[in-house]
From Swiss-Prot:
<dbReference type="GO" id="GO:0005737">
    <property type="term" value="C:cytoplasm"/>
</dbReference>
<dbReference type="InterPro" id="IPR002222">
    <property type="entry name" value="Ribosomal_uS19"/>
</dbReference>
<keyword id="KW-0689">Ribosomal protein</keyword>
<comment type="function">
    <text>Protein S19 forms a complex with S13 that binds strongly to the 16S ribosomal RNA.</text>
</comment>
<keyword id="KW-0699">rRNA-binding</keyword>
<dbReference type="GO" id="GO:0003735">
    <property type="term" value="F:structural constituent of ribosome"/>
</dbReference>
<protein>
    <recommendedName>
        <fullName>Small ribosomal subunit protein uS19</fullName>
    </recommendedName>
</protein>
<dbReference type="GO" id="GO:0015935">
    <property type="term" value="C:small ribosomal subunit"/>
</dbReference>
<dbReference type="GO" id="GO:0000028">
    <property type="term" value="P:ribosomal small subunit assembly"/>
</dbReference>
<dbReference type="GO" id="GO:0019843">
    <property type="term" value="F:rRNA binding"/>
</dbReference>
<dbReference type="InterPro" id="IPR023575">
    <property type="entry name" value="Ribosomal_uS19_SF"/>
</dbReference>
<keyword id="KW-0694">RNA-binding</keyword>
<dbReference type="InterPro" id="IPR020934">
    <property type="entry name" value="Ribosomal_uS19_CS"/>
</dbReference>
<dbReference type="Pfam" id="PF00203">
    <property type="entry name" value="Ribosomal_S19"/>
</dbReference>
<dbReference type="GO" id="GO:0006412">
    <property type="term" value="P:translation"/>
</dbReference>
<keyword id="KW-0687">Ribonucleoprotein</keyword>
<dbReference type="InterPro" id="IPR005732">
    <property type="entry name" value="Ribosomal_uS19_bac-type"/>
</dbReference>
Length: 89
């Protein structure tokens, strides 16, 4: 089920404030966040956000194509190691 349109997108307030501050000052610093559910807004474009995947922070450079998606989509939490196969002896 998707989020109600009357509520608007969820963007972490602390993350949004840090991005706005960087846009005003012109600085580009990697921002660490645990807010995987945050929606990427157009203000995030051009910044690098380090998204936590449960183990470590994955740096995500935000482009225009990512606007409207969630930060967690770009930091996978599971690693696929392959299915058991025939071992060569």
């Amino acid at each position: 089920m998707s989020r109600s349109l009357k509520k608007g997108p969820y963007i972490n307030v602390k993350l949004e404030k840090r991005i706005f501050a960087m846009n005003e000052s012109g600085k580009k610093v990697v921002v660490k966040t645990w807010a995987r559910a945050s929606m990427i807004s157009p203000d995030f474009v051009g910044h690098t956000v380090a998204v936590h995947n449960g183990n470590k922070f994955i740096p995500v450079y935000v482009t225009e194509n990512m606007v409207g998606h969630k930060l967690g989509e770009f930091a996978p939490t599971r690693t696929f190691r392959g299915h058991a196969g025939n071992k060569k002896r």
